[in-house]
Amino acid sequence: MLSRQVADKLAKYETPFYLYDIELLNQTLESLMSIANKYSYKIHYAIKANYDARLLQIIRKYGVGIDCASGNEVRCAIEAGFDPKSIVYAGVGKRDKEIRYAIEQNILAINCESIEEINLVNELAAEAGKVVNIALRVNPDIDPKTNHCIDTGQADSKFGISYEEILSSVEHIRSLKNVLVIGMHIHIGSQIRELHVFENMCNKVNVIVENLTNLGFELEFVDVGGGLGVNYDMPENEPIPNFASVFAIIKQHLKVGNREVHFEFGRSIVAQCGELITKVLYNKTTATGRRLVIVDGSMTELIRPALYGSYHNIENITSEADQRLKYTIVGTACESTDVFDENVSLPLTKRGDLLTIKSAGAYGMSMASRYNQHDLPGAVYSDEL
């Protein structure tokens, strides 16, 4: 929990805002990269998790590449100083102009998610007079044991190309003159906490890579995605995810020869270093006796609870009361679903108190909106307090 001294310093900032723990971010990256380098694994940061400029500069210093899901994310990464040859670009709906931009920038690979997309990349590459590196994003039909809203690897998902369609299109893909298949990409989902899922993924990848190789594709890398979850329930108990356990599973079960193994981590890098600081506006009690705390933050700053039903630990960082009550924490947006959590046990909470909504460094600011014409939240960094 934030100390009273830190809470007092935060009082001068206009709420709501994101507070980023720079020391924890550095510790997380040091932990990740020390283990990744041990295995010679390549790491890409999933920039969709958080594109804050200050965080990107820190991440870049650790030699991490970038995983993008839009042309503007590619642009953001390049403008932040990342080497284009460390950038991979996935996404099921790449626009022509986005593909053209990626081709112009000579990024490492465009991860293609349909046969029609491969055809378009080939056409646009021909226009540019280039041969463009692509990776085949394969839908592996794996249940990642996570929230269905962030499951990307089952058979009916919009993501990736079915293995059967790739097999039926081999001759066509190999006939294209302006694309070169250099990688295989897979991503089964996000917030995965059951690590045996990664073993199942490895077994499926091994078969796919062997068959693609036998069909004549000379793969330089295998990108196994990311998806490692974080502890939203008790973030203080696990501020840094268990990268070592995931890498140990991959090392034991993934059999892809001398090919480079790439990962795409987003949530696991930045989730725990960020929290949303919001101020209590009002208290009221409904006709049914439910105690509401209305804060100046809302689903426009942090949409995950409203969108996914996601849980975030909430604390009152200014109240010193001994009495604790159960509250429902709601935001200012004109939506009934704008609820951060229900039955939250907090010390007696009054107007002006500061609450922190923890583990909000990933998919918080990057999913923020200006619905109801709300201002976008600011950012405060721990080393500047």
Task: For each feature predicted by the language model, list its residue ranges.
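A charged N-terminal "starter" segment
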Residues: 1-132, 174-180, 207-214, 345-348, ...
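Hydrophobic residues within beta-strands of alpha/beta enzymes
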Residues: 66-67, 87, 110, 184, ...
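Short beta-strand segments
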Residues: 46, 133-139, 185-187, 223-225, ...
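Charged (often Lys/Glu-rich) extended helix/loop segments that serve as interaction or gating elements
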Residues: 249, 258-385
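Short, glycine-/Ser/Thr-/acidic-enriched flexible segments
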Residues: 24, 50, 73, 94, ...
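Active-site loop/helix belt of alpha/beta enzymes
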Residues: 141-282, 346
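Hydrophobic "anchor" residues on beta-strands that sit immediately upstream
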Residues: 44, 133, 221, 260, ...
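Short acidic, glycine/serine/threonine-rich loops at helix termini
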Residues: 56, 79, 99-104, 121-124, ...
